[in-house]
Amino acid sequence: MLSRYIHIFLFFSYIIPKTFVGLSMNIKLEREKLILFTKVGAIVLTSIALLSASLMIYPDTAATLSNSLVHEKELPIYCVEQDKPLISISFDAAWGNEDTPKLLEILKKHNVKATFFMTGGWIQKYPDDVKAIAAGGHDLGNHSENHKHMSPISAEECKTELMKPHEKVKELTGKDMILFRPPYGDDNDTLIKVCRETGYYPIQWDVDSLDWKDYDAATIIRRVTEHKHLGNGSIILCHNGGKHTAEALDELLTTLKQKGYQLVPISQLIMKDNYTINTEGRQVK
């Protein structure tokens, strides 16, 4: 920071003399130039010293000034500030449905409501599964029409990717989806703004099961239940088509309950209004 002050002083020491170029070079004017330059230099250095001292005394002011000069990225919801031990488990559905009935059966056994993020293609291919998910009281979530990376596309294309599956689910179930998870977790400011404009809450996750890597059931369970970010307000990511996800789910839910967690759908975990999202992606009041 000191180097910045030096540069400012050097700037004034260069500019001020230049303003006098072309003026009479008599002794009186030269003396006035010197006096003026000295006064301005003293004022500048005094101001810099006072500013530096105030920023050290009031660091919050310094942070505010810094933040006002830096563009703040729009953030989705990765987790939620929660006093109670509430968490959510979610399943991305983009390919296959072989294990979906088993997942729903296990969720019902544990009286757990989950959130399913579905692509437009999956909705169209497996309409009965969509209806079964809705009938089970689970959240119906939007996972885009074509499961493409969202950050490179325009706002209009983002809107199309959101609204096509929205209309399909509305036609099948009569329900309006309000949760959107971008494929690959790929988001940017444009997408987040489109979500808000279309009535969606952009949702990510803070606990990844990595079930899509075909880890065995024991590894999936351990990854989730021992995850460093697992805590009140966590959102767990799984996939309905994971090779061992269905095999792991029963014990996973049992272990999470033994740890004292209550599982609720994401729509019940998040705040709907009067919130902000901090730099960690945590939704807070």
Predicted regions, residues:
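N-terminal Lys/Arg-rich, disordered targeting/topogenic segments
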Residues: 2-37
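Alpha-helical scaffold elements lining the catalytic groove of polysaccharide deacetylases
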Residues: 97-99, 148-176, 186-232, 244-248
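Residue-level detector of anion-binding/catalytic polar loops
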Residues: 113, 139, 201, 208, ...
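Hydrophobic membrane-insertion alpha-helices, especially the h-region
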Residues: 39-56
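C-terminal domain-boundary segment and adjacent tail
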Residues: 61, 69-83, 109-111, 122-124, ...
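Active-site beta->alpha N-cap acidic-glycine motif
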Residues: 63-153, 157-168, 173, 177, ...
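Active-site-proximal beta-strand/loop segments in catalytic clefts of secreted hydrolases
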Residues: 91, 118-119, 145, 181-185, ...
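Conserved, mostly hydrophobic/aromatic
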Residues: 92, 107, 143, 180, ...
